[in-house]
Each structure stands twice: as C-alpha cells, then as structure tokens.
Amino acid sequence: MYAILAEKPSAAKAYAQALNGKRQGRIYVAPPSSLLPEGALICAAVGHILEFLEPGELNEKYKSYSLDSLPIIIDLFQYKVVSDKKEVLQRIKDTIFDKRVKTIILATDAAAEGEYIGRNILYRLQCKKTIKRLWTSSMTATSIQKAFSQLKADAETLPLYYQAKARAESDYMIGLTLSRAYGILLKEQGIVPHNTTISLGRVQTPLLAEIVKRERLIEQFTAENFWTVKATFNNQGNVYEGEWFHEKENRIFKEEQAEQLCELVRNQSSTIMEMKEEMRTYQPPLLYXLSTLQMDAGNAFGFKPAETLKYAQSLYDKGYLSYPRTQDERITESDARELENNIQFLSGHDTFGALFPLPVSTLMNNKRYIGEVTDHHALLITDKIPKDKDLSEDEKSIYHLVVKRILAAHYPDVAMSHKEIITKVMDRFTFRSKGKELLSKGWHHIIPPTNENDIMLPTLLKGSEGVVTDTLTTKSKTKPPNRYTSSSLIGFMKNAAQAIEDEDRKSISNLPLGTEATRAGLITLLESRKYIEWKKNKVYPTLLGITVVDSIKRGSVIKSPILTAKWDVKLNEIGASLYNHKDFIAHSKKLSSVLFEEVKTYSSTWNQNGVERIKSESIGACLLCGSNVVLRKGKHGEFYGCSNYKDSGCTFNLPFKVLNKKLSKKQLMELLKNEKTDIIKGFKWKDKTFNAPLVWNREDQKVQFGK
C-alpha cells in the first residue's frame, strides 16, 4: 500500500478524486487501481509545518541580543513543529507509519520549495520507507492520473531539496545576522525607536534600495518647461500635420525660439524629403507566467502581486488553472495536445463561446509557444471549465485574463500599415509626420489595445512641394521618472539588471530578483515592515525604509542584485547536481561574517553621513509621568506605552482591545487628553453587548468603564 503526502488539503482532495478515493476521518483512502494496485492513504500538510529552531535554542550565546553574539553561524540546523501544526504532523506520522504502507509517494508541489517541505517532514519523522515522487503541474484528474503513471525515482528530485535547503539556511543566517546587527546599532545611536522592527535580506534589501533610489530621483528632479512646434501642410490638396525635430530632439526649451520658428515657417513652401510606408505584423503575446499575469492584473484591476497570486492559487486549487507559480511562458508538445482538447470546452462558455471556431486550431509546431520548459509550463486552463457564477469577481477577472491570453495565441497576427513623412521647410527645418492604419485586426479581437484609432496620412511623392498653412506651439513640462506601481515593480524584479553599475551590467543582461513564487511575498514583507506604503497603486518608501537603505554602506553586496544573480547561478547548479550544497552554505557563512564586520565599521559614520533619525509618533501625554505615549513592541505584539519606561521604569500602557472591541487611535488620544472617551459602542461580555465610555481612574491608576 502507498501513503501519499500532499502539500495542502486541497491537493489531497484533488488526488483522492482522481483516484476514486473517499474521505475517512482526516485522511482519504484510495481503492486499489491499475495506477496503485494496493490502494493508498492520502494525507496532507498545510504548507510549512516545520520551522528552524531559534538560534538561542541551539546555542545560549545567541539568546543575547547583542553585537557580541554575532554573526549567527549555525553548523547543524534543527527544526521544530510550528506551534499550531502539531496535530497535522501527528496525522501525517500515523499515515506513513501505517503497517500496511510500504512506499511513500511525495506529492507536494512540483518545485524546489515543495521538495523542501515534503522531505523535511519525512526526515523529521525518520521515515526509512521507499520514496517515489509525483510530479504534476496541473490538478485535473487527467493530469494527476498521468503523473501517477509516471512516478519519478526518489534520487531524481533530491537535488531540488538540497537547492531549497541551501537557500533557506543561507538566507536565514545572513538575514538574521544583519537584521540583529543593524537593529542593535540603529537603536543604540537613537536613529530608530526601540520598538522598531529592522530586517534585511538578500532579496528584500536590493528591492527596497531600488524603491528608495527611484524616490530620490523624483525628489531631486527639477521640471523644465519646453515647447513643441507643429505645422499644417497642404501638398497639392493633401492636408496633413508634422512636428518639428532636429536630429533626435523635438523639444525647444525657450518659448521665444518656438514662437520665432512658427513665424519663420508660416506660409513658406515645403518639400517632401522622405516618404516611407511599410506593413508591420505584431504577434500575439506569449502565454502567461506568474509575473506577467501579475503585471497585467495590476494594470487592469489594480491588484497587488500577492492578490493576483492568491486568486490564481485558488483557481488552481479548484482545478480550473494549472500551477500558477511558473516562470515559463511556453508549453511542451504534450501540453499543446492537451490544451487543444481543453480549449474546445470553452466553446459553450457564455463569455467566450462567440469567439469559436478559432482561426488557429492548434499551437502544435509553433516554436513561439512550443519548446522545452523548466519545472512548470505556462499558465493554462484545464478541462474543468467554470461558469462565471461559480467564481468570485476577482477570480473571474484572473481566469478571464488567462483565457484571453490563450485564445489570442490561436488568432493570427495583427497587421498595420505605418507611414512616415519627412517634410523640409526653407531648406532648414524638418518636420516628421507619423500615421498608422489597421489592415487586419488579428488577435486584437481578443485583447484590444488601449488606443486603436487610425492616424491617416496621404501617400505623397518624394520631392513634391506644398505650403505651410498654419503653425502651433504647445507648452509642456519635463517629467520625473514614474513611481513604481505593483505592475512595474514586478517588471523590475523580473530583470533587475538596470539597478547595477554599468561595468557589471555588461556581463549580466538578465537578473531576476526573487522567484515567481516569492516576489509577491517580498513586496508584502516590505509593507509589513513599514518600509513602503501604497497610495493609489503607487509605492512610496517610508522614512524608516529610507533610513535603513541609507545606513548600508554604498556598494555593499547586500544592497545590490548582483548577490542574488550569483546565488541563483549556484543554486540552480545545486538543483542540477552540478554544485555541492555544503560548499554553498560554507561560502554563505563567510559572507555573513564579512557583512557583519562591514556594518560595525560603517555605523561609526552614520551621523556624519546624515542618516535621518526617526522619532516615535506620540499620541498624547502619559497619565502617570507626563512623558510621550508611543507605539511600542512587546512579547505579545504592539501596544501604546510610556516612552520613558527605560529611564524611569514607568509602566503606563493602553490596550488595543477591551472586551473584544478594538479601540481606535482617535479614542486612545481622547482618553489621554480628557481622561475619558465618548461612549464607545460594541463591548461584549458573555452573551451581552453594551455601550460605555472609558475613563482613567486616578486612584487605582487604571482604565475602566464609565457611566
């Protein structure tokens, strides 16, 4: 008999359905079949159910939050069960050690991280049974059954475990060492408040540095006025417009010069110097990888990357989409054959049925879409087609994007005619006219462009003459670089080569920051650390984010994507059995020590380099000692307390919640100012709900309910 270990309950359910299994208690039982002749027990983790032991649990010296305990170097990582996941691990243990089970099928996600999650559990339980690996990018019954018929040998995917292990352990040591070091030093020098959480990391810090760099460019930008000049021409009855240009410049930075140009050319004769006309074709876009889906969803719906991943993951869990955390935009011939079958199920769909029959019936033999893929092919629909009413609005938005992308690939190229006329006036001044005309709509039937209006130009003879009948100047301003949006931030992370110095950029043309699976989480992490904030889908660094970046030495590898580039090369080599994971971890330990020494030395220059100090925002005066009441951090989370607690031992604090009622900042400020609040609605005690003000009892020195 087999025991199947899934990464999450939804996957276990999908496996059970594909194998005609039934639920028995907290697991599924699949009957004997041609795929699994002895049947199977199916259990599930819930993602990561194990976590590293804290450094202080491994070594007493690391319990001390001091520079003397750094860097954190761990020779043998050990794991503990996540506090609320003990029951899950016990259920897995009971399943795989069932006396009937002879072979374990590791069926976690088909990627390095899935390998890491699954094998950590098996190693923790000291499982010595035979292991087989299930590898599938789709959760449809057909794909699952096919994967069970082609189980991989244990050794075939083991290198992916070492790849993920090397990354996790190295990131942990470097991240924790630097987070502690910078946190201690920034707080010691009074640059950040003592309740501030400071974190640095190989990927999060270069991303934050880029956001801060863009903000600085915007702040330092000085807008300039400029003018453009347009002329209207009449060439033997053919009227058209052109814009002045000289070499590559079409802007004039002095108004009087623009006006003079208008006066000079008005009513003057003109000559056609060049007349170009060509037909261009535009291929349909490639299929979606996660990043390109996140970019389009951000532009179309304002979704943050984490939201797009959430909805795509939900569609995958329900069996409507293939595995979403993919970096590939192509598919294999086998995938194309399956897609050819699945796409026909859309012909009866309320939204997409009218688009059938498709002009191109198959993607087979189309090298633009068909080729080798890495772990997972591009995002595809499955043979399970949902009705719009079965999806939430957000899920529907994502599903429709993916479907349209696939359908567009089954339409011909867009064909457009482009014209360009270069007109010369007074044998001195040149004007450019550009026109376009849609000849064949092609895949724009499926994905219309934002602006498809034709700009018609006449066909004129080179050397033919006309006259300038009118001129117009238009005033504009130079614009700073755009702030990053959720979409453009993902675009930057797909290739961060632009962020590195010119001499290094020559050798690195493609530099991804993070992976398809981690990018959304990295952006969310910066937000949770209060390093960035969002305003109308644009990202801004906070003062804390700027301070952290400024505290890092210029040129430090922790602030540059170069480190990630080098790591990715080696990590991929580990996954391909071309490099030893132990050598990688040894190098990471040395780097952790180097970066720790770097911050110790550089921190002495923070004052002279103008690293900005951040003061805690006060919400009022302490009712015991009169000092500021600020947001602080304790063992059980954040709370408002006296800022003078270290010097005077003042213990004053205010609760965030009273009887399950969350108090607003405004209510807490009112309490500090007036020693009472207005009536607050919604307190709950046992089965009753009541309304009451909060008051400060001076005698007992505590907050209580008033009348």
Curated annotation (Swiss-Prot):
Monomer. Residues 1-140 form the Toprim domain. This is DNA topoisomerase 1. The keyword Membrane does not apply. It is an enzyme of class 5 (isomerase). InterPro entries: Topo_IA, Topo_IA_2, Topo_IA_AS, Topo_IA_cen, Topo_IA_cen_sub1, Topo_IA_cen_sub2, Topo_IA_cen_sub3, Topo_IA_core_domain. Keywords: DNA-binding, Isomerase, Plasmid, RNA suppression of termination, Topoisomerase. Pfam families: Topoisom_bac, Toprim, Toprim_Crpt. Residues 199-204 are annotated as: Interaction with DNA. Residues 157-596 form the Topo IA-type catalytic domain. One of its GO terms (molecular function) is DNA binding. The record marks 48, 167, 171, 325, 529 as: Interaction with DNA. GO terms for biological process: DNA recombination; DNA repair; DNA topological change. PANTHER family: DNA TOPOISOMERASE 3-ALPHA, PROKARYOTIC DNA TOPOISOMERASE. The keyword DNA-binding applies. The active site is at 323 (o-(5'-phospho-dna)-tyrosine intermediate). It catalyses: ATP-independent breakage of single-stranded DNA, followed by passage and rejoining. SUPFAM superfamilies: Prokaryotic type I DNA topoisomerase, Zinc beta-ribbon. Belongs to the type IA topoisomerase family. CDD domains: TOPRIM_TopoIA_TopoIII. Releases the supercoiling and torsional tension of DNA, which is introduced during the DNA replication and transcription, by transiently cleaving and rejoining one strand of the DNA duplex. Introduces a single-strand break via transesterification at a target site in duplex DNA. The scissile phosphodiester is attacked by the catalytic tyrosine of the enzyme, resulting in the formation of a DNA-(5'-phosphotyrosyl)-enzyme intermediate and the expulsion of a 3'-OH DNA strand. The free DNA strand then undergoes passage around the unbroken strand, thus removing DNA supercoils. GO terms for cellular component: cytoplasmic replication fork. Its EC number is 5.6.2.1.
